[in-house]
Design a protein with these regions (language model features):
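N-terminal ligand-binding lobe of clamshell/alpha-beta domains
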Residues: 1-142
Length: 142
């Protein structure tokens, strides 16, 4: 099992090493989870986002670890992508602001179990971000 684990670890390290740094003009993404919860520098989610080729609004606003964004901050900074969690039927006050009608025009992607732990599955999350970045670039011509 050790050899198999080493091979998986090497493959993951190789995949991550072959990703380029995020360009200054890369799409801007905002983590906007229930209650405005946002993730900044020093989090796995931020690392996934950057490895996928997007900038993180929370980091540009100086967030270290986690914090909160207001609806007004999100609208003011006009991120290219909103990243939220899956919503479920019913009503939750914590989800009220992330369902606000003013956010309807923003492309939205949802985190999944691939974002949770630093396992080789994070490559799936990175690939999801990269696909969204590519889709935005195709649409805008950048």
């Amino acid at each position: 099992q050790d050899a198999k684990a080493d091979a998986i670890a090497r493959a993951l390290e190789h995949d991550l090493a072959n990703r380029s740094d995020v360009a200054e003009d890369a799409p801007l993404a905002a983590f906007f989870l229930p209650n405005g919860y946002a993730l900044g520098a020093g989090t796995l989610s931020h690392d996934i986002l950057v490895a996928g080729g997007a900038r993180n609004l929370s980091v540009e606003l100086g967030f270290q670890g986690n914090g909160t964004l207001s609806l007004e901050q999100v609208i003011l900074h006009q991120p290219d992508i909103l990243i939220g969690s899956q919503t479920y039927p019913g009503f939750s006050l914590s989800e009220d602001m992330v369902r606000h009608p003013s956010l309807g025009e923003f492309p939205m992607m949802h985190t999944s179990v691939d974002w949770v732990c630093g396992t080789p599955l994070v490559v799936n999350a990175i690939d999801e971000v990269a696909a969204q970045v590519e889709k935005l670039r195709d649409r805008t011509g950048n």
